[in-house]
């Protein structure tokens, strides 16, 4: 009966499995430290705290040992590597193992399926399932759990339910983990009523919901604005002696701050402390983000300083959130102080950090500082992206450096394969503002040749420029084209607020 699963699920054959990972993807020359005998490493607690580079070194020591280690030994290393969330590496190791003639067993196949699912490569996961069953291995409930998670990860909820039906027909009984996976997928798809029905089904079957079940449902209900249902769920959770954990509190706090209910979020934080649940980085990051969103920068900085005193130290996300908050409200020098502190504490600024600061200094007219940050970013080997270039382009335009903006724009077109309509909108808008409507019109007319399709914003900018400084005939022609393309409503909506929509904030929102 269980062979139903082969025909019902694993319709994808194992073709292409060996080609899924490029052997050069992770670099064969990864740093390898000298190990004592690999058996000693596997026997001790080394795997519990293994680092990525150590996993690589240990793997290559194992495959070059004589005799070769057993699949049980390799499975222990695969498990440890998967726990590091290095799923592609596990796939790479598995590929190498096959080349060395090391045969998989049920456990290693299950790990491989799990990693393919985590990488959203379901066709390969199903290929492995088919292969293992052809070799006589029956999948376990853990194997099916990984596949379920994979289906839910790519929003194939219908396929996930079909898999559960096949599991039941084949004699497998869904457990709490299976139900939790389905409930999570349903909540993320907005199917909360079905998720709640599954909770009732669990109770009827005598499967007690755990803290993960309730956390998932609470988050889904809150994000859908079903506050009364969420409150009822929380009461039911505590009534069943399932104590809220850090995930519960953090999820609720995050929802409250995003909804603008900051007072409720802070009350929940106090309740969290009173319940002896220690907030983590995610908790503090959510609170800081909410405070920054609503302009309460003093409170955000106070919370930032509070973290360390509570033994929870800021990470890159924390710094980026607060820097973004300061820059949003034009307090760029405060943002720069945090950037410098971040570097002193050993954190490497990422592309988001640099883009935020460059944008902030462009907004306050300190273009020279923005360009210096850009140069520093490149010197630190952080590669600028299209957003970085668009922010600088916009900064040059709004600060009257239109000739420099044209040079920048031409550089972007030469270096980027596709710069997109946003960059064109910024440049056309800058030219119109600088009374260079003819040049803007030339650029607009070049869009089809460049393979870039104008959007409502492009038409609006160009029509306004023509109405102010150019021939009305071309403006009328563009309005006619907008009607033909069904975007005249956008023009009407913006027509009453022309100055507002040509502001730097509105323009840059198209970039970020």
UniProtKB/Swiss-Prot annotation:
Cellular localization per UniProt: Mitochondrion
Keywords per UniProt: Mitochondrion, Repeat, Transit peptide
Recorded GO CC terms: mitochondrion
Highest rank taxon of the organism: Eukaryota
Cytoplasm found in the keyword field: no
Keyword rRNA-binding: no
Pfam families for the chain: PPR_1 (PF12854), PPR_2 (PF13041)
Transit peptide: 1-34
PPR repeats: 70-104, 105-139, 140-174, 175-209, 210-244, 245-279, 280-314, 315-349, 350-384, 385-415, 420-454, 455-489
NCBIfam families found in the cross-reference section: PPR (TIGR00756)
Family, per entry: Belongs to the PPR family. P subfamily.
PANTHER family per the UniProt record, alphabetical: PENTACOTRIPEPTIDE-REPEAT REGION OF PRORP DOMAIN-CONTAINING PROTEIN (PTHR47938:SF46), RESPIRATORY COMPLEX I CHAPERONE (CIA84), PUTATIVE (AFU_ORTHOLOGUE AFUA_2G06020)-RELATED (PTHR47938)
Name of the protein in its database record: Pentatricopeptide repeat-containing protein At1g64583, mitochondrial
Organism: Arabidopsis thaliana
């Amino acid at each position: 009966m269980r062979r139903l699963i082969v025909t019902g699920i694993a319709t994808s054959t194992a073709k292409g499995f060996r080609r899924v990972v490029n052997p050069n993807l992770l670099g064969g020359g990864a740093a390898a430290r000298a190990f004592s005998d690999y058996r000693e490493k596997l026997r001790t607690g080394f795997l519990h705290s293994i680092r990525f580079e150590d996993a690589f070194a240990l793997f290559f020591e194992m495959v070059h040992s004589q005799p070769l280690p057993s699949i049980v030994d390799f499975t222990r290393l695969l498990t440890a590597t998967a726990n590091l969330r290095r799923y592609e590496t596990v796939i790479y190791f598995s590929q190498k193992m096959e080349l060395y003639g090391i045969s998989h067993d049920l456990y290693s196949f299950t790990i491989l399926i799990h990693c393919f699912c985590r990488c959203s490569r379901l066709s390969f996961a199903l290929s492995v399932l088919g292969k293992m069953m052809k070799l006589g291995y029956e999948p376990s409930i853990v194997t099916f759990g990984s596949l379920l998670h994979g289906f839910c990860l790519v929003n194939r909820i219908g396929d996930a339910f079909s898999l559960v039906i096949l599991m039941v027909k084949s004699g497998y009984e869904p457990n709490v983990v299976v139900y939790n996976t389905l409930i999570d997928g349903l909540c993320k798809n907005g199917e909360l009523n079905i998720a709640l029905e599954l909770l009732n089904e669990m109770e009827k079957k005598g499967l007690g919901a755990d803290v993960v079940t309730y956390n998932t449902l609470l988050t889904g209900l809150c994000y859908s604005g079903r506050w009364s249902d969420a409150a009822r769920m929380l009461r039911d959770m505590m009534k069943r002696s399932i104590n809220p954990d850090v995930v519960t509190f953090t999820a609720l706090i995050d929802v409250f701050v995003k909804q603008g209910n900051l007072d409720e979020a802070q009350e929940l934080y106090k309740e969290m402390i009173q319940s002896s649940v220690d907030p983590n980085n995610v908790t503090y990051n959510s609170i800081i983000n909410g405070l920054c969103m609503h302009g309460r920068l003093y409170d955000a900085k106070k919370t930032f300083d509070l973290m360390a005193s509570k033994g929870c130290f800021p990470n890159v996300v924390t710094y980026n959130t607060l820097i973004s908050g300061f820059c949003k409200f034009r307090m760029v020098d405060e943002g720069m102080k945090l950037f410098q502190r971040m570097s002193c504490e050993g954190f490497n600024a990422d592309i988001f950090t640099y883009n935020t600061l460059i944008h902030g200094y462009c907004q306050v007219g300190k273009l020279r500082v923005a360009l210096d940050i850009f140069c520093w970013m490149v010197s630190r080997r952080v590669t600028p992206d299209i957003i970085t270039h668009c922010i600088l382009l916009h900064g040059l335009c709004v600060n009257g450096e239109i000739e420099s903006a044209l040079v920048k724009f031409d550089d972007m077109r030469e270096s980027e394969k596709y710069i997109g309509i946003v960059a064109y909108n910024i440049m056309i808008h800058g030219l119109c503002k600088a009374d260079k409507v003819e040049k803007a019109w030339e650029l607009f007319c070049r869009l089809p040749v460049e393979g870039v399709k104008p959007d409502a914003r492009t038409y609006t900018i160009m029509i306004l420029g023509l109405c102010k400084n150019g021939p009305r005939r071309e403006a009328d022609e563009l309005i006619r084209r907008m009607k033909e393309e069904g975007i005249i409503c956008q023009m009407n909506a913006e027509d009453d607020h022309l100055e507002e929509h040509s502001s730097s904030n509105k323009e840059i929102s198209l970039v970020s």
